[in-house]
Structure formats: C-alpha cells, structure tokens
C-alpha cells in the first residue's frame, strides 16, 4: 500500500498566477493542494514530498533554481517518490518531448483547457 494520499496534489511552478488558478480549480473538486513556488533545491522538494505525501505532482519545466527536468528525474530516481505520477507542464511547443526526456508520466501544455487538468488528476489518482 502506498503511503501517498491520492487526494493530495502538489503543484511546482514559479508562475504564481498559474499556481493560483490550478489550485482553485483542484480545491473546488475537493483535492488538497500544496504549492511549491519554484524549486530552490532538491532537499526542499523531497522534504515537501515527504511531508505532504502527494498522490500526483504537476511539475513546470522552466523554473529558476532547479529545472523541472532535473527535479522530475530526481523524483523518479528516489525510492520515496518514484511511484508518484509526475505530470510535466510547459508553454513550449515540444512539451511532450520534454516530458519524455524528464521521465514524467504525462504532460499538460500551459494555457490548457481546465477540464484537462481535472481529467489528468482524476486519471492518475484513481
């Protein structure tokens, strides 16, 4: 049995507006949401994962400090977090390739249709 709480959603992004919108949508569907505004270092990210125990993580590609690619690779190589689905998001046209290179489970293009956020969350936390 996983120690992660399926209803917990971790959003990692440096765009506060994007975080706020995603958080609001997910909270209205009764998901518990934790926001990590950017990723200063891997210890911070792993600490949040250890404490919050997300059932899914949405990871931005472009962030100051630790890149989304490095953070996703670390999550997927760490025994604590390797089974947690990571959904990669970016405004770049090649988001699918970026997600694959990072080892993410799926991807979501920024400026997405909001039901797609809910669809992916429900699919990976079911």
Predicted regions and their residues:
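Acidic catalytic/metal-coordinating carboxylates
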Residues: 67-73
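Alpha4 helix (beta4-alpha4-beta5 surface) of REC/receiver domains from two-component response regulators
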Residues: 70, 92-109, 116-119
